[in-house]
């Protein structure tokens, strides 16, 4: 019986017992009964209580740093005694765990490097991603890059396959599309071979009138406007119309000359568009108003709409000064004008019922609104 009681009181000597196991770190010897009182042992044969194994608690913990065994982990905060130096994690089963997908973390902190995930190279991306060009644009690129500005059908195929690896997967589909675009698009002209030029097949070249449709790798289906292609003609026509309409007025002639593109670009063309300018102006005004409101919200006038009649209508625009918690209401409330002389007419009897109107306002936010301020009740009237 004596041996059973000594074993029942064994939790007070739990430190030396756990140190003898050789599995847990020495921080477990600081485990105190005041935080987690151990249960009584059911039988004398049970020598190692499982309630002190922190592996059961840490196994279900969602803390991801237990998987990295980072040097930045300190001892648990609920362990008694002075905090020791930074050491390894107190989870025994995680010491020798194999981590095939996690590489060594950086020296600055925890975190594993996913060595199995590799970013594709530029060549792989070009094979996977379809080029953002139409078949007409591809043909125009090939012909425009040739020294003599003409290519055969096989040379166009070769150019597309060499510069865009995406089309190497299935050649039948895109080659058929290129043949259709060559035959159906009027911008591509067939040129016969010379007699002294050996080979098979005709050359394909670009129509000189369609070369302006090729802009920055994008081949337009529609031609440019005459105003875009011939800016000088449009400007000269504008000057002639200005002279005919404003004949005899030097002011209109000076305006036409100053705005003509031949004399040089106007300042408005280099600046933002009118829509953008209006938008920026409006936004700057809104921003300035919001800054004023944030700086002193109580100093702005507050308008209160109340059912007050004619001559007895008080000033509805009241200015408030800034509020500080250390001052009282009488110190920071702004002075109000004296009440005007009251009339005994029954039309002003509504001014006497100022209590329900003022009850909906909080005195902390609107301290200047009182029965002696904006609303002037009749003398001798019971509220």
UniProtKB/Swiss-Prot annotation:
Chain positions of motif Nuclear localization signal: 220-226
Single Gene Ontology BP annotation: anatomical structure morphogenesis
Pfam families according to UniProt: Forkhead (PF00250)
Keywords for this protein: Developmental protein, DNA-binding, Nucleus, Transcription, Transcription regulation
Keyword RNA-binding: no
Region (Disordered): 1-55, 215-277, 317-348
Low complexity bias locations: 25-35, 234-249, 317-330
Ranges of Polar residues composition bias in the record: 1-12, 250-277
Descriptive protein name: Forkhead box protein I3-B
